[in-house]
Structures are given as C-alpha cells and as structure tokens.
Amino acid sequence: DELAGIPGRINLLNAQLIECVPVNFVRGLTFNDSIVIVDEAQNLTKSELVTILTRFGANSKFVVIGDSNQSDINGKSGFGPIYNCFNNKSSEREGIFTFKFTGKDIVRSEILKFIVKKLEGV
C-alpha cells in the first residue's frame, strides 16, 4: 500500500497483475513467467520454504526476504538453513544470489538504527 496505495493495489489485483497466495495453497502450482516475493520467510519452516521454492518454473525470479532475528516460530524457522544452503559460489553460478542487510541499511528511522545495534548484543 505504501507504493501503489490501496486503490492501486486493488487495481493490480483486479487486473490479475499481482496475486497473493498463502503457503498452504501453493502445492501443485508452477510459477512460470513470474516474479515471486516470499516475505517474512523467517516465519516459515524448512518444509514450507521447500514447498514454495520447488514451484519454480520457467522464466521466473524468486525473492525470499527474511530476518532470522525476528522469527516467531520458536526455533522452527527454515530460513537460516535455506539461506545458508544457497549462500555460495555454486549457487551464484546458477544465478542464485544472496545478501544481507546491515544496520547501516536501515532507513525506517534513526532511532531504529540505535535500537538494532543495542539488540545485537542481547
């Protein structure tokens, strides 16, 4: 809603240019000619992430976004292991890239930079 506003989001959904699919409903799908954004991936189990990633079809891009420090599924997150699995040169040769943001990348607010830095040591 920040980028397109609510009317813009509704128009994109109605035009079927974007689609929101809960993880429970991706089984059996193949994402061809798509850009798939998986947000809050730290709250998905390894099994759920595997289910999503194995829907990868032709001419598609997947963007998986997560913060291991913000998982709320009590140690069951699959995000860290999946990230580490693809954080290497062989994955890069296949066109799979990973990166991490640091505290310097925070743009939400200056106070948040301070808070995140303090929380790193907790």
Regions found by a protein language model. Give the residues of each.
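Conserved helicase motor core of SF1/SF2 NTP-dependent helicases
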Residues: 1-38, 42-122
